[in-house]
Amino acid sequence: GKYIVFWEEFYKSCQKYFLSDSECVKQYYVFTDVDKIYQEDVDVNIHRFYQEALPWPDIALKRYEIFLKIKDILIRDTDYVFFFNGNSLFLDYIVWPEIAPNEQQGFLLSLSWNCYDDNRKFPYDRNIYSTACIPYGKGNIYYQSGITGGRTREYVNLLQECKEQTDIDYFNKVTAVYHDESHLNKFLLDRKIKVLSTNYGRPEEWETPQYPKMIFRDKYKIFGDEINKMKGIKSRCLFIRFIEKMKRVIQLNLILK
């Protein structure tokens, strides 16, 4: 889809800053519906896979299913896998010890902005009919899905379990509140993993940390209000707030009874 506009700068910055000091071979696996991407005819480590542009929120909900299409390739050709949002941009050098999860961390990593002071404020899915549901009072960290990764075997397991959760919800006509991110948080609940700070994935429009090593570019600068139309953000947010208020009323009534 239209996110392909971010690819060239992502690739250039990744080549320069991400693990550029190590002996690892960086393989790029790009899912897109365009016929050609920057440097694919030059760099043999760029692998483009056709993926039709799905409507929102299917493109998010189907993320794990899409990645698993190349499961055998990942297992055969990689030791570690890292996923970065399409609008990611590296700004400073990131070396292996910073990014590599160890055995004590389950060989998995994810990003957390750590911007909540109370786990009751975590935007977990609270819908008891969703496989992504996390009850109030549970969980210590809320993870952002813009960066995930780990040793290939463990990461493929993450993809498979999250896909299974998503498939069950899809069959039951249930949509997790924040789609793939909600399912990621359910999978990672109470697991010990490597947690990346906002320094490794700061929204471009934020002012702190002042010198991040990687940012998520502001999509509104590129797409403007069109991004709202793509996601139906206004109506969806109003609906979510309404549902959350109704849940609180129901829970309060149950307590009073």
Task: Tell me the role of every PLM-derived stretch.
Residues F90-N127:
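Conserved donor-nucleotide/metal-binding helix-loop-beta segment in metal-dependent transferases, i.e.
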Residues M214-K257:
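Long, low-complexity C-terminal extensions of enzymes
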Residues G1-I59, I70-D77, F239-K257:
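N-terminal anchoring/stem segment of glycosyltransferases
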Residues D41-L54, Y64, E98-L109, Y211-I215:
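Active-site regions of enzymes building and remodeling cell-envelope glycoconjugates
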Residues Q51-F84, D92, H179-L184:
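A conserved donor-nucleotide-binding helix/loop in the catalytic core
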Residues T131-Y220:
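Catalytic core and acceptor-binding pocket of nucleotide-sugar-dependent glycosyltransferases
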Residues G1-K2, D35-I37, A53-L54, S88-F90, ...:
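Short, solvent-exposed loop/turn segments at secondary-structure junctions
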